Amino acid sequence: MTHAPTPPAASNFLRPIIEDDLQANRFQGKLWAGKPGPAALQAQGQPDPARIRTRFPPEPNGYLHIGHAKSICVNFGLARDYGGVCHLRFDDTNPEKEEQEYVDAIIEAVHWLGFDWQADGNDNLYFASDYFEFMYEFAEALVQAGHAYVDEQSAEEIRASRGTLTEPGTDSPWRDRPADESLLRLREMRDGKHPDGSLVLRARIDMASPNINLRDPVMYRVRHATHHRTGNAWCIYPMYSWAHPVEDALEGITHSICTLEFEDQRPFYDWILARLAELGKLARPLPHQYEFARLNLTYVVTSKRKLLQLVREGYVDGWDDPRMPTLFGLRRRGYTPSSIRLFCDRTAVSKSDSRIDYSLLEQAVRDDLDPVAPRSVAVLDPLKLVITNYPEGRSETCSAPRNPHDPQAGVREFPFTRELWIEQDDFREEPPKKYFRLFPGNTVRLKYGYVVRCTGFTKDQSGKVVEVQAEYLPDTKSGTPGADSVKVKGNITWVSAAHAVPAQVHLYDRLFADAHPDGGDKDFLACLNPHSKQTVQAWLEPGIEAVPGATWQFERLGYFTVDSKDSRPEAPVLNRIVTLRDSWQAA
């Protein structure tokens, strides 16, 4: 895996914690049987070759986005840096929302981002559904030990009895039922003898706890739904807050790294692990949960509900629309894996919520592409320029560096002819002050070509300038002796009209015009940027091989890539990745 140049180090509060754990030998004696399992299995294992174990645990109910990329980079990066292993685990405990399509897409996205979960001869690709038998066995053990009970209240009754931040909850009438009675009901739940929502398994903790999450949280609920992996084998499914610590412990995770919304769940996480370890079900040392602030970007929404609405209502062209914050959208836009890793490395890992300006993501891809992207010329808004004193039918070769940062890349060659395409913005009939490009009587250099002097222009019936005339100075060709004898203040790019390659170019910009589209009571759809996609018919420098994924810096314009979906050899389609400079004011 090739990484971008090392960025300035961003703070990461987790690093000192891990270093302290390793220095104190907190995981010394930790055993690993080569696969996840309970204490009895791990006791048969060898000392764990991984110094630490982390995990990236997506739910397979959608496509990964830039926020997930941060979590991926944090978990895989810490494991890499400290001689550990990062697991890819699918938290597939909600059968009504999960699909194999998303599993496949997540695997592809994590691989594309540059990370691998194979280590020490193990695949380290896991599914929560692989642990359903363990979870159920542990649930029975908790019931028998008096730590859990089956509640027959409705969801509304449970909610009403939970209390508030200032008032304690009320005990369920089923809280003190005998353990064998709860065990019987739990087995009936598993055997499909009760309808959805009729019974739940709850932990017996403390209904007066100041932390509402410890007021007998629900662990299992009845759901007669087909699971994408287990089919109809189960009709009870674990709640995430119960499954999460069990999964971590079975996999020997040392540092369970979550986003801040799970901070209030940590006491329940610790309670579950402690009770199951006391019962001999889970091996010590136990995992510890740490929370960091999720990545929030200006001009972006990452809510699955809102992204789905954008797709379903046609505001974007699917999940891989180049304006979407999904990893597939960013990939199609032309963002490289190394640019996204670079961006994530430049953002701090902290416990304080903040918003990162979108310009930092754009700058990361500029910094990543600048040293490697070949240069070329494109004209996006073409205007004909005729060199009136240049012979008709004549063509000569001009040359330019493929990449000024890499002399080994060599030069590119392209023809100069009588008729050229230039940008509309490079001519003014009546120029403003400090305008140094073409206007009647002014002299400019055609970059890599000749110096020319504007002699006239032609308008159509509507008054639009459709052609500019100029004369060239024969002794001023770039790279020849005496070429700099004529001093000019303006340089403009061009392509030969007879040789240029026609292409459709999508000029993508930020999807939202508001820096905080999901803030407060805003209608996020009202914040959409009406200019987030503009399509133009452009002319490209000849010699460009428009294969999907090929990327260039078009001089003066920005970075562009060949669209992976719509481009064809006979009809190239390109996407603008990013402009050369930030054109937005800081949010």
Swiss-Prot record:
Locus of motif 'KMSKS' region: 301-305
Gene3D superfamilies linked to this entry: HUPs (3.40.50.620), Ribosomal Protein L25, Chain P (2.40.240.10)
Motif ('HIGH' region): 58-68
InterPro entries from the UniProt entry: aa-tRNA-synth_I_CS, Gln-tRNA-synth, Gln/Glu-tRNA_Ligase, Gln_tRNA_ligase_bac, Glu/Gln-tRNA-synth, Glu/Gln-tRNA-synth_Ib_cat-dom, Glu/Gln-tRNA-synth_Ib_codon-bd, Rbsml_bL25/Gln-tRNA_synth_N
Pfam family, one: tRNA-synt_1c_C
Main localization (coarse): cytoplasm
SUPFAM superfamilies: Nucleotidylyl transferase (SSF52374), Ribosomal protein L25-like (SSF50715)
Protein's GO biological process: glutaminyl-tRNA aminoacylation; glutamyl-tRNA aminoacylation
Repressor as UniProt keyword: no
Catalysis performed (reactions): tRNA(Gln) + L-glutamine + ATP = L-glutaminyl-tRNA(Gln) + AMP + diphosphate
Gene Ontology cellular-component terms listed: cytosol
GO terms of molecular function: ATP binding; glutamine-tRNA ligase activity
Localization in the cell: Cytoplasm
PROSITE patterns: AA_TRNA_LIGASE_I
Binding-site residues, ATP: E59, P60, N61, H65, I66, G67, H68, A69, K70, S71, T259, R294, L295
Domain of life where this protein originates: Bacteria
Family affiliation: Belongs to the class-I aminoacyl-tRNA synthetase family.
Subunit (UniProt): Monomer.
Protein name stated in the entry: Glutamine--tRNA ligase
Gene: glnS
